[in-house]
């Protein structure tokens, strides 16, 4: 927990620069104290268009309902992936990088949605 999170302007100085926020609790801010929320480390480049880079920490909530357009952690026949869920006449797991192809799910494949991405954490 960070005891104090001062506000710092990235533009012109402000007379309000000495204003300070209350305690910044990342557990509360990212809503990670609930048992349905977990963190995963991203690997690969298929989701760079969604702002997810290798080594990012992806916060996932198992209790959220995945809807069309959600970023989801899914398992296809037991293999895990993070993609954008597109629901239409068929279900597509869409990578957010043009160098990667969509995953079109057939009726023979077993899809399990493990959770919806709610936040990304990245070190600079």
Regions found by a protein language model. Name each.
Residues 59-60, 73:
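Hydrophobic beta-strand signal
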Residues 96-107:
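Low-complexity, intrinsically disordered Gly/Pro/Thr-rich segments
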Residues 1-48, 68, 79-80, 87-92, ...:
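Short, positionally conserved secondary-structure boundary motifs
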Residues 55-56, 70:
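Structural motif
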Residues 110-111:
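Flexible glycine-rich active-site/ligand-binding loops centered on an Asp-His dyad
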